[in-house]
Structure formats: structure tokens, C-alpha cells
């Protein structure tokens, strides 16, 4: 009688045992999120009325529409902040590793800063940084 061996076929490939804590953590986090979402749905309010659909205005009853247009300069300042905040993050990352990067890293970050400064000068010349009463007089 000949014995045949059946290969161990699994849906999941064999993973090293070091991944077991990560897998358990992932499963536990997913289950916890599911339980919390289910509890919020189950315990949450089921009724809706006109007052629940209004935006919260610190207890003051709203008198007009909440959909007001913001002036464009606020949007521009927010975009400028994001651009230069990302620049600061890149420069900080470069500064933490400047010894390892050497001269090549210095050349790259200098090029990066020059490009951003040229963009800032162009923006300034186009009037993108002018807002308020002085811009309205032009």
C-alpha cells in the first residue's frame, strides 16, 4: 500500500511568527472599531426634526443661511500657509540629516529654497499677498 502525501495548501501563505502580534493587533483594532460604530448606531438618536438639522451656532438661533462665501484672500493665505509649512517640513527633515547628505544635500535644499523664493517673489509682484483696504483702492 503506497502512502500519498498531500501538500499543505492554504489560502494564506505561511508568515513568520513575528507577524502574529501585528495580525492580532489589526484584528483587535478592527473589531473594536466595529463594536464602537455599532454601539453608536444602536445608542444614537433615531428621531430627526428641524432643529437637529440646523448648524450649531453656540445656542443662538440662526437667522440666515449658513452658506456664506468667504473672501478669496483668506483662501489664498491658507494656501500660502500650506505651501510654506510643507517647505518648513522638508527643511527640517534636511536639517536633521545634513551630515549624512553632505554637499549634494546642501545643493538640493538650496535649489529647493531658491525655487520657493522665486515663487514667493512672483506671488508678491502679482499682488497675491496684498489684501485689505490697500488692495481695494487699486
From Swiss-Prot:
Single Gene Ontology MF annotation: NADH dehydrogenase (ubiquinone) activity
The reaction(s) this protein catalyses: a quinone + NADH + 5 H(+)(in) = a quinol + NAD(+) + 4 H(+)(out)
Naturally occurring in which organism (per UniProt): Geobacter metallireducens (strain ATCC 53774 / DSM 7210 / GS-15)
Keywords from the UniProt entry: Cell inner membrane, Cell membrane, Membrane, NAD, Quinone, Translocase, Transmembrane, Transmembrane helix, Transport, Ubiquinone
Localization of this protein: Cell inner membrane
The protein's assembly and partners: NDH-1 is composed of 14 different subunits. Subunits NuoA, H, J, K, L, M, N constitute the membrane sector of the complex.
Entry EC no(s): 7.1.1.-
Enzyme class (EC, first level): translocase
Spans through the membrane: 19-39, 74-94, 103-123
UniProt membrane topology term: Multi-pass membrane protein
Pfam family, one: Oxidored_q4
Role this protein plays: NDH-1 shuttles electrons from NADH, via FMN and iron-sulfur (Fe-S) centers, to quinones in the respiratory chain. The immediate electron acceptor for the enzyme in this species is believed to be ubiquinone. Couples the redox reaction to proton translocation (for every two electrons transferred, four hydrogen ions are translocated across the cytoplasmic membrane), and thus conserves the redox energy in a proton gradient.
Gene Ontology cellular component terms for the protein in this record: NADH dehydrogenase complex; plasma membrane
PANTHER family xref list: NADH-QUINONE OXIDOREDUCTASE SUBUNIT A, NADH-UBIQUINONE OXIDOREDUCTASE CHAIN 3
Family of this protein: Belongs to the complex I subunit 3 family.
Name this polypeptide is given: NADH-quinone oxidoreductase subunit A 1
Lineage summary: Bacteria, Pseudomonadati, Thermodesulfobacteriota, Desulfuromonadia, Geobacterales
Main location: membrane
Amino acid at each position: 500500500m503506497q502512502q500519498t502525501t498531500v501538500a499543505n495548501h492554504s489560502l494564506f501563505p505561511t508568515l513568520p511568527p513575528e507577524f502574529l502580534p501585528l495580525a492580532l493587533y489589526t484584528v483587535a483594532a478592527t473589531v473594536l472599531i466595529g463594536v464602537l460604530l455599532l454601539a453608536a448606531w444602536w445608542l444614537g438618536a433615531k428621531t430627526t426634526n428641524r432643529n437637529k438639522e440646523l448648524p450649531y451656532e453656540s445656542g443662538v438661533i440662526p437667522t440666515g443661511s449658513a452658506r456664506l462665501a468667504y473672501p478669496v484672500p483668506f483662501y489664498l493665505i491658507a494656501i500660502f500657509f500650506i505651501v510654506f509649512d510643507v517647505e518648513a517640513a522638508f527643511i527640517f527633515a534636511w536639517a536633521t540629516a545634513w551630515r549624512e547628505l553632505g554637499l549634494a544635500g546642501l545643493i538640493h535644499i538650496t535649489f529647493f529654497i531658491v525655487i520657493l523664493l522665486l515663487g514667493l517673489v512672483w506671488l508678491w509682484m502679482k499682488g497675491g499677498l496684498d489684501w485689505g483696504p490697500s488692495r481695494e483702492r487699486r
